Amino acid sequence: MAYSCAYWPEGTTADLAAAQRAKLDLICAKLRLRPGDRLLDVGCGWGSLACHAARHHGARVTAVTVSGQQHAFVAARIAAEGLDELVDLRLQDYRDPVGGGYDAVAAVEMGEHVGAAEYPAFAARLRDLVRPGGRVLVQQISRGAHRPGGGAFIEAYIAPDMHMRPLGATVSLLEDAGLEVRGVEAMREHYGRTIRHWLARLEAQWPAAVGLIGLERARIWRLYLAGGAQVFEDGRMGVDQILAVRPGVGAQ
């Protein structure tokens, strides 16, 4: 289970699950994960990256989340997949002690929830957690310089803590923190496609969704997904993978 943008390699017509796996493969490839590498997954969500990196790349993963519900879900998933020796799951804030010297650090659609005032400290924390020469990948939603971020609807009903900025502003903040940005991949079209898949699944399971969260809440999510797909398709919002390294010995 994943709640972030999937990825369809050019020319593919894969289903959503395969596209999510392709996104995870893309992240792991950019981070150049090798067996035994230490990966920190900041805001690990439902555990898809942590489990994928451990199972398919042999990474030793530390995954952190502040959500008790996500922690319980991921813990069960780790046990079911037999990954207890490779994934260290922690219920904590990324600012709390979590070790250091990681070969790679990933933050997948977590930075939007940090807040404008806290983002410089967030970027500095990413730099401090990765070893010199290590890689950092930030996947994050962006907006145009003169366009609103989440907007009143999202802030009221979906994600009151969401803050988005232009891509260039995020790159500057990462560079100001001492990271060297090596590459950016824009994935806007992929998010429109991802959300259309989510909306189709919601419609297909509409009675179950209403039974689970009630009619009003289900309608809010239907409107959110329909509008969200449209703003990505229209280019009013984007999503980008930003790859950076901490300068030092071993940087490539």
What residues fall within each predicted segment?
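Conserved Class I S-adenosyl-L-methionine-dependent methyltransferase catalytic core
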Residues: 1-30
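Conserved class I S-adenosyl-L-methionine
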Residues: 35-43
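Conserved SAM-binding loop of SAM-dependent methyltransferases across substrates and taxa
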Residues: 46-57
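Conserved SAM-binding strand-loop segment of SAM-dependent methyltransferases
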Residues: 81-94
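A short acidic, Gly/Pro-enriched loop at the edge of an enzyme's catalytic core
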Residues: 95-105
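A short glycine-rich, Lys/Arg-flanked "PGG" loop and its adjoining helix->strand segment in the class I
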Residues: 120-132
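Conserved beta-strand signature within the Rossmann-like core of class I S-adenosyl-L-methionine
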Residues: 133-140
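Substrate-binding/catalytic lobe of Class I Rossmann-like enzymes that use SAM or dcSAM, i.e.
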Residues: 142-252
